[in-house]
């Protein structure tokens, strides 16, 4: 048996070159960038009275293109799971800086623990998620051993 399968270096680069946008209000969008601390992100977390968050999606499991209907159903299930766990979220999206990547709906789960974020990412067969802590640069967290 081999070790856990990790995303290709190209996929990891694509994840790192994505702007993770959260709709803080109808007129304000906050952008999270991996490894780049932004006081606006801290302000969003502080305004929601949380110290942590995670960008999560259920779209395109294992970064394999999946049909619109299946993606929408999976995303609805993710949002339902967050509600069951009592975790508030903000609608968002991942927008690749390379315009060949499609915009991917996401959520910024507020106040979630890192363990819970990883469990949800694994449940929805995601290669990675973005971990956010107030006062720190956001981190790309790989979820190895999914396949």
Where in this protein do the model-derived segments appear?
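A general structural signal for short secondary-structure junctions and capping/turn motifs
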Residues: 45-47, 99, 119-122
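A short secondary-structure junction signal
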Residues: 67-68, 119, 140-143
